[in-house]
């Protein structure tokens, strides 16, 4: 498990200038990837609903409320936006934003699985972590589950059967019950699993357990086990399935805190419900107590067309090292800011002989969200 001293952590996160050291060591990073909703948007826009002040997202909004117990270790960005268009083209749909989170570039502007032709031949964060001997893990919901008579179950396969999940799948099953929303619907999307788009971290076009990179991927159920055993990686990427990450509404809608939601509101409620269970689980762990940092990250804004930048995207940091008490930072951030921050934190920056990954060279790190 990576540990960085307090003084070093402050220096690594600084954008420049003199700041006092943060208190305590930096521990594991947990990125929880959410989908397709603006944090704030103009009132006239109603195709999708925004997250801030949305009654379907009470847990998220409790994190943003000063004085609320859930907000104790929370800082968030009020000016986090999509990365700028590249060559005149906005960075949509989802997949190029996930690729950007690893490499600072976008790859192909589609949502196809990595093979046969969506591999991105660029250096990436997880590949550099791996080459430097540091640990990373991609936890993906609905993967590596056993089947009975062709039907998916909720039972996790033995670790010896785990794979690199290169292929998307979805459906319903009478022998499957989602642990968070209680439905029989499942949907794994490779486009939301950024590490599978780089050959250094996907092990090639091999969906069998023999793939040497299989050890870096795990079903989401394994997260609670690793937290309990204090064996989480230095860098942990967590992707809920397409219902729990706010991408899609369950076919029957979703009842949450006594209210039945349908459509876009249901997708928000499903994601909020997921976060309300997973975030406290991580916060209760030794890894979090030892300086762990949770980043609730949203892939892209919605509805901006060819002129992005009008709407903001959700970026929430939860850590004992955060400024806390729902501190909102107005510094302009994008996905490149996260990437630059992680390169500094894990000592993979030019100071240690590494090149900045893509657009992270032009970004501000997330310094304003942390104690100084």
Language-model features: where?
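Gram-negative bacterial Sec-dependent N-terminal signal peptides
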Residues: 1-19
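N-terminal pro-sequences and low-complexity stem/linker regions of secreted or lumenal proteins
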Residues: 20-372
């Amino acid at each position: 498990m990576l540990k960085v001293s307090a003084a070093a952590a402050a220096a690594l996160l600084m954008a420049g200038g003199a700041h006092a050291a943060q208190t305590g060591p930096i521990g594991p990073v947990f990125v929880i990837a959410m989908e397709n909703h603006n944090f704030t948007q103009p009132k006239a826009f109603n195709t999708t609903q925004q997250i801030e002040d949305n009654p379907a997202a009470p847990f998220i909004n409790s994190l943003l409320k000063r004085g609320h117990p859930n907000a104790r270790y929370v800082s968030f960005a009020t000016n986090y936006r999509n990365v700028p268009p590249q060559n005149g083209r906005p960075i949509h749909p989802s997949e190029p934003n996930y690729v950007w989170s690893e490499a600072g570039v976008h790859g192909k502007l589609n949502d196809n699985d990595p093979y046969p032709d969506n591999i991105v031949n660029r250096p990436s964060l997880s590949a550099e972590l791996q080459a430097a001997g540091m640990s990373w893990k991609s936890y993906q919901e609905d993967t590596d589950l056993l089947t009975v008579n062709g039907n998916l179950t909720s039972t996790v396969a033995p670790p010896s059967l785990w794979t690199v999940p290169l292929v998307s799948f979805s459906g319903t099953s009478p022998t499957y019950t989602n642990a968070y929303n209680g439905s029989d619907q499942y949907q794994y999307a490779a486009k939301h699993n950024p590490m599978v788009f780089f050959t250094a971290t996907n092990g090639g076009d091999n969906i069998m357990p023999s793939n040497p990179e299989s050890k870096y991927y795990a079903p989401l159920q394994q997260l609670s086990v690793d937290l309990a055993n204090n064996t989480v990686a230095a860098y942990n990427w967590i992707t809920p399935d397409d219902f729990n990450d706010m991408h899609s509404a369950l076919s029957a809608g979703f009842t949450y805190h006594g209210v039945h939601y349908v459509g876009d509101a249901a997708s928000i409620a499903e994601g909020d419900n997921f976060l309300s269970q997973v975030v406290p689980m991580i916060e209760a762990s030794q890894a979090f107590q030892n300086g762990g940092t949770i980043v609730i990250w949203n892939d892209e804004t919605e509805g901006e067309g060819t002129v992005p930048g009008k709407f903001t995207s959700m970026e929430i940091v939860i850590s004992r090292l955060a400024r806390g008490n729902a501190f909102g930072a107005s510094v302009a951030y994008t996905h490149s800011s996260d990437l630059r921050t992680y390169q500094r934190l894990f000592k993979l920056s030019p100071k240690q002989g590494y090149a900045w990954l893509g657009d992270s060279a032009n970004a501000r790190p997330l310094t304003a969200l942390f104690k100084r």
